[in-house]
Amino acid sequence: KRNVRLVTSGIKTHKVEIDKEVYYLDSRLWRKLEQLAGPHIALWFDNKGRLVTVTSLQWRPLDNIELVIIILELLGDNVEVVTKRVDDVELELLVRLEDVRIPELGYYTIAVHNVNDGSHALRIFNGFTVSDCSNIVFVGSRIFKRRIIHYVDRVNIHRLELILQTDITRNVLRFIRLHEDLNRVVLDTNIALAILEYSKTKNILTRYIVEDVVERVVDEYRDNYLTLWDLLMSVTYVTTRSNRFWSCFDRALTRLVKFVHLLDSYAVKYRDGVVYAVA
């Protein structure tokens, strides 16, 4: 809670005193502040003391996701935990930047967690920063509830990285199919093979998933030959012309061939997504 007082007003900039400290606010943001005036206002400042975002914390679980607005232009160095109670349900907005900013990543990690009434709320985890609404990372599969998918479609997020850490759901696969322009999809190794297995009959794998599944599994299961073999047999159901995919595929094949000591007499060829083993 801060004591905010308008000192002088201008066409583009207002001089404002907040807890006896002077800040210069964009006139548009000041109008937004007046519009949202109340006890539950979030003021976000950059490291030069300039207000970059004004947001109301009077948001509701997922039916009207005003919370997402909070992260759009968040540049503050020292944002603390904000807790708001709505209808006796505690909804947490956890944003801890401080020393955890990783500029080269350029996004927050957002996940969905259950709240007391069984509904869902967005939760922002530390470790990342956000530059704009077009670069958001969703973690976990609960995020793919129907309303979340609708919301993401509505705000038109062009660049989205998808990190799946739990189970596969129909909504997850539907979401992936709707967003085939994903820059990349990062898959938890524990579910990579499950996705491949599921995709055999559903025919929903995209090139991005194939690449990251193969790369992740090959790298992390490099000494688990049975898993590598299962992976290679799974991806034969997928056709791709991606050089990155076949590079990973080739690494896995090479390790398997070495493992069975048939490198000199056993050649493995692949073309158009089909593996040909030739003795």
Task: Enumerate the language-model features and the residues they cover.
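Intrinsic disorder/low-complexity polar-acidic segments
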Residues: I65-A279
